[in-house]
Amino acid sequence: MTKIVAVVGGKHSGKTTIIQHIARELKSRGYNVGSVKEMPNVRWIDAPEKETWKHGEAGVEIVVGAATNETVLFIKRKLALNEIAAFFKGFDYILLEGFENERAVAKIIAAKDASEVRTFCDGLAIAVSGIIVESKEEVEKASTFNVPILNCKVEVNKLADLVEQKALPLFPNLAHCKECGYGTCHELAKAIIAGVADLRRCPLYGRTNVVLEVNGQVVPLKFFPSLFIERTLIGMVSSLNGVNHVTEIKLIVRKA
């Protein structure tokens, strides 16, 4: 299960430095780690003088730059976070820089002062770090938010511990699900981070005996649809010649 944590904050607050230190620490613990940087003020990553740019101008939807030591994928549209996360199948953690508007992602606040902590404190914060640690006065002010304030350079082990304990997988954010007993995925995420709820409350992660993917995205199943699919498929497959005891079924349907 891939888990995600976002490092959020204002400009020059230390976001990238925090990501670097946490990534190294998680890697040293044997995890597969990926990262995504949000660039809301940048329209194009590719450059007009590059051949890859010219490929895109010809109208192709995806351009791949295959170099000796790295491969770059240019997709000619903005992707939602769940689409981006699909590229990280098999990874343990995805570290996001930015994405403060995500409503069900655990967050580390990078701040220069206590006022910035207040700005980004939305009930999803698991830690505060960044430039603020250089000022005892600002640290004292920010301590009122009851979120651990850690120096990423000398306390990265504690930050990584919090990531291990508090990072969440990507929630489905279904508007009318409420199967977990909370109003939204945002409310459930806050409750999990606060320690008053469990990830198993989410139908997507609480019942793993039936997993439905549509177009590469996992679809949460409530109890009765899950039970119906499970019993129907097992009943049909068990009747086929050559099938003995069924322990797992993989079915792929492609629309013609």
List each language-model region with its residue ranges.
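Walker A (P-loop) phosphate-binding motif
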Residues: M1-N41, E138, P172
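N-terminal phosphate/diphosphate-binding loop that engages ATP/GTP or pyrophosphate donors
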Residues: H21-K76
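Glycine-rich phosphate-binding loop used to anchor ATP phosphates in small-molecule kinases
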Residues: T71-S115
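Conserved C-terminal guanine-recognition region of P-loop GTPase G domains, centered on the G4
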Residues: G98-E138
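Immediate flanking context of iron-sulfur cluster ligation sites
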Residues: E164-H176, A194
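Local cysteine-cluster metal-coordination motifs and their immediate loop/turn environment
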Residues: L174-K190, P203-L204
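Non-heme iron-sulfur electron-transfer modules
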Residues: I192-R207
